[in-house]
Amino acid sequence: MELAIPYKYNLHRQYLYSQLPGIPDPLAFYKDCLLLVSWRRQLMAGLANERGDYGGKITWFVVMSCMMAAVGGILFGYDIGISGGVSSMESFLKKFFPSVYTKMENDTKISNYCKFDSQLLTVFTSSLYAAGIVASFFASSITRSYGRKPTILAGGISFLVGSAIGGAALDVYMLIIARLLLGIGVGFANQSIPLYLSEMAPMNYRGAFNTGYQVTLDLGILFAGLVNYGSQKIKSGWGWRLSLALAAAPAFVLTLGALFLPDTPNSLIQRTNDQEKAKVMLQKIRGTIDVQEELDDIIEASRASTVNENSFKEIPRWKYRPQLVMAIALPFFQQLTGINVIGFYAPILFRTLGFAESASLLSTVLSGVVGTASTVIAMLVVDKFGRRALFMFGGIQMLVSQLIIGIILALHLKDHGDLEKGYAYFVLVLVYIFAAGFGLSWGPLGWLVPSEIFQMEIRSAGMSIFVAVSFFFTFAVAQTFLAMLCSFKSGIFFFFGGWVALMTAFVYWLLPETGNIPIEKMDQIWKDHWFWSKFVVD
């Protein structure tokens, strides 16, 4: 097989699909993963010339703007990490969920896998995502009509209020109200921030900039783990209040910073059609006066979008079918990797394996370190190696680690008694390997790819659908995991492993490469794809 292929998508399609008509055996699949990196560089070099390389450079202005916006990732990550930590604190369980605490401490007959099975406890975790589903659709209208900046600001304010109520909670009802407000904040932030980052970033560095959102999300999880580890040592039992209330710190930074964020040139053209103002902003963020080609593409995309004012009515059309499928499939698969199970319930999971409260929280901190480090690596290499290569390498890594964890637990963790220390630490290492695989692939890319595939006329609707689907399945997984763990026991890891295998095959066959392609010319990848070209016509 020759690696040097012409820079044409029809030959790209022939290479990938005509010569591989069936499902590949494992050796061929792995070989193609390795080949992908080599020929992608050649392919993308030609595509950059065909589709427009706007030039420009990374400026401090765009770096600081994107860093401020990406603080929203810390909010989301902190919430993911904090809920599982406080749910394993004895003082928190005694006050709000006494039945769970009694079952954990005194019921010797209950299975290891069922100690934390409580619908009320899962509502505490999952209610945030129910609110986020609704909020994401309201956020779409605000983003389209008023710009990305007001949506980010509204998300910060909602999160700030929710954090204060959570830290001051006196009963379960106050906890749930706080979680609902946090969900509104996260829904607004997740709908607008990835869009903001994609539109502000230079084309050749869009992957790195947008992956920064996942980096800050992982930093939020890590920060939450450190806070939980420290606050559970407070003897008087109010450490959980500190854990919940400290979410106000990044919320305050985001709210204050959003006041000074510039709007993107894309949003300025879409809302006001002020071409001169958009050109000045584009020159400022690109660090060059030669921005006319990029500006013309933005204007052309905006004109197409004004023909169809209601993007939610437009997105079901056949010509947008690939983007709609990805807006649903990518967040669906992302949640079924099982990563949020680790994020939400890692301390509970580690306690199930036999670790003490303090040790389980420390193990969660280390998991956060691994996740953050792997996401930083992804940020550095995603624009060089491409999205598809990282998706597949990370998918294989997650699949193998989950299968081995499932086998160990099936053989050595029974309904009663702790897992032997040697096996427990081995499972811990495998959890870290799984977290690293996610950090290289579905973590950052699950947010990056959806943020860059939508044409301007459907962009806000597409991101709203993506965020809503993400929240829906996050809610579903969070709400059902403890019951599934009780029912499936070790089989829960085979369940998620099967989904990882399916999603890796989905990426291999149906997701085209999106790297190094101007965001306003992304529609071409579907026209040149072996399958999606059947739906997309000029």
Identify the residue ranges that each predicted region occupies.
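Alpha-helical transmembrane bundle of multi-pass membrane proteins
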Residues: 2-22, 29-286, 290, 296-538
